[in-house]
Design a protein with these regions (language model features):
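A secondary-structure micro-motif
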Residues: 1-184
Length: 184
């Protein structure tokens, strides 16, 4: 855990997401008046829902206690994950404790093959927790859940213009007639 110099007087509450310019750092564990305690994602007691960026593959990212290593266990044993894939937060209801779509890290190794009981990937965090200086706390999650943007759009019918009838040479052309005044 680390302490930050913002607390309840600054609007912080328990279970808010903590980030920096590189990605996810952790979550607010406990808030005091002018400070807060943050549990880091690398902490062995830490876990967060994760998703392979650009796909629907989800799993649990857990801290290992090492500053440069996380464990990502896929929920689907047939799921596809490979070295070089980015892992982002899946998100929590109401954005707490984790807002969705935040960068977590890059897959560096995968154990187990598709179809085995479990597939575990080793993830190198984007954030170097040993070099933290300025952090941000997500006080209000995004209005629209970014993970929804990875879902395919519902198919929509493309309107086709209706054909316009044109008179052919064999058809008679109609002419407008104006009624003549009656002598009546």
């Amino acid at each position: 855990t680390v302490a930050i110099d913002a607390g309840s007087l600054d609007g912080l509450e328990d279970d808010m997401t903590v980030i920096n310019g590189d990605g996810l750092i952790g979550r607010v564990l406990k808030v005091f008046d002018s400070t807060a305690t943050v549990v880091l994602i690398v902490d062995p007691e830490s876990s967060v829902g994760g998703r392979v960026a650009g796909s629907q593959e989800i799993g649990i990212v857990s801290g290992t206690g090492r500053q440069n290593s996380l464990e990502f266990q896929l929920l689907d044993p047939l799921g596809q994950v490979a070295s070089g894939d980015a892992v982002v937060t899946f998100g929590s209801k109401g954005g707490r404790p984790y807002a969705p779509g935040l960068p977590i890290g890059e897959v560096v190794d995968v154990t187990g093959t598709a179809g085995e009981l479990s597939r575990v990937a080793t993830v190198k965090p984007f954030v170097d927790v040993s070099e933290l200086s300025v952090v941000g706390v997500v006080v209000k999650p995004p209005r629209e859940d970014p993970r929804d943007s990875v879902l395919p759009n519902a198919p929509s019918a493309i309107p086709t213009p209706a054909p316009t009838p044109t008179p052919s040479s064999s058809q008679e052309k109609e002419t407008a007639a104006t009624p003549a005044p009656s002598d009546g």
